[in-house]
Amino acid sequence: MGNSTESVITDYLVRIITREGNIRALACVTTNLVGDACRRHGTLPTASAALGRALTGGVLMGALLKTGQRIALTFEGNGPLKKIIVEADANGAVRGLVRNPAVSLLRDDGKLDVAGALGKAGFLTVSRDLGLKEPYTGTVMLYTSEIAEDLAWYLTESEQIPSAVGLGVYVEQDGSVAAAGGFLIQALPPGDDQLIDRIMERIASMPPVTEMLRAGATPEGLLEYLFDGIPFDILEKRATALVCSCSRERIERVLLSLGSDELSSLIHDQGEASVGCEFCGEHYNFTREELERLRDSLTAV
């Protein structure tokens, strides 16, 4: 991905493996990148929580890839959010969008209703670009529509890797993102049922991720809680950031793809053009002279 919209580099991810080598886990703090994305998309609180969870999930899933590989997550439900799309790479870069950012839906207990906003019926599609001719794509039905459980269900069901995922985004009364982050835990063969049960008990007794992050927990702190008394080694610490791959050159290629006649009509009817990126909100403006130069480059070929 490019570097057009990097967040302040204070968000980061930690990857570990148990000393026995049978459990791997990742945890990350994504408060700044989620806040940046939500500001760019003008999301209302429930849309902020949903997009933030999906972005954090993308960071975690991306960290399982090899350098040069990318992953795309598409959550599509029958709720008012309609669709969330997230793209991430192996280097901690992520970008995303929510099709309808103007959603603020509450549950009966007053908490943000992410599942209701996404919709109980729908699909999660995961596409991995592994550098082959075609990306590997898998689709599962939404499990709870809470994002974290849907990712865990996909990993367990579609990729046959027993997984647990926890994601959290805390949105303040003023709509700002106060905390965001999460964890992903996977059992590696041969499985140790006793150890897995022990970790599942820790997950069950764990305070909400957002509560721990607001209290100052780091990715290391989340992992230390989850793996209490279980020796592990830290394999990697990596910065994560909101990074978009859009650029003026890419937009120029899109305009060139319209063809000479379409560009001539655009010049005649509007005289200029402003093209926005749906992922980061960046706008690229083209004057009449610039559009004419693009059109003339086509006719000169």
Curated annotation (Swiss-Prot):
Under oxidizing conditions two disulfide bonds are formed involving the reactive cysteines. Under reducing conditions zinc is bound to the reactive cysteines and the protein is inactive. GO terms for cellular component: cytoplasm. Its main location: cytoplasm. Keywords: Chaperone, Cytoplasm, Disulfide bond, Redox-active center, Zinc. It comes from the Bacteria. The keyword Zinc applies. GO terms for biological process: protein refolding. One of its GO terms (molecular function) is protein folding chaperone. SUPFAM superfamilies: Hsp33 domain (SSF64397), HSP33 redox switch-like (SSF118352). InterPro entries: Heat_shock_Hsp33, Heat_shock_Hsp33_C, Heat_shock_Hsp33_N. The keyword Nucleotide-binding does not apply. It is found in: Cytoplasm. Disulfide bonds join C244-C246, C277-C280. Pfam families: HSP33. Redox regulated molecular chaperone. Protects both thermally unfolding and oxidatively damaged proteins from irreversible aggregation. Plays an important role in the bacterial defense system toward oxidative stress. PANTHER family: 33 KDA CHAPERONIN. Belongs to the HSP33 family. This is 33 kDa chaperonin. The gene is hslO.
